[in-house]
A protein has these predicted regions:
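Positively charged, solvent-exposed patches that mediate nucleic-acid binding
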Residues: 1-133
Length: 133
């Protein structure tokens, strides 16, 4: 009998896992601050968390129909989640909410360039700071 090859398991430390934004109100609040940076692979929006919500950074992902069909949108969001998981814990600011918006080329963009896009957008957003309006 042939044995199935065992897949390597990813070690996920639950304390390091990113908290996701889920409500429409949170997405609209972040969009309303206008602290944003656009790059070829993504758009990043940022806002400080309201009140005392725990101080851990939170992140949301979105991809409109402009990105492509459902398969392309889901692939783009998966790639944004992977990029955020590798960049935000080290470079994101505690107490901030981030929204990553996929663009038309997100699903085909080389992963290294997607990481560079996110890092550059984080630097730009941290320089700008949120402007209420």
């Amino acid at each position: 009998m042939r044995q199935a090859a065992e897949r390597p398991r990813r070690a996920i430390d639950m304390t390091e896992r990113l908290i996701r934004l889920r409500t429409r109100a949170d997405f609209l609040r972040v969009a309303g601050t206008r602290a944003r940076a656009a790059r070829p692979g993504l758009v990043l929006q940022a806002a400080p968390q309201p009140g005392e919500t725990g101080a851990r950074l939170r992140v949301g992902y979105t991809a409109s129909r402009r990105v492509g069909n459902a398969v392309a949108r889901n692939r783009a969001k998966r790639r944004l989640r992977a990029a955020a998981a590798s960049v935000l814990p080290a470079q994101g600011r505690e107490g901030m909410d981030y929204v990553l918006i996929a663009r038309a080329g997100t699903s085909e963009r080389p992963y290294a360039e997607l990481l560079a896009d996110l890092e550059g957008a984080l630097r730009q957003v941290s320089r700008l700071g949120p402007r209420e309006g």
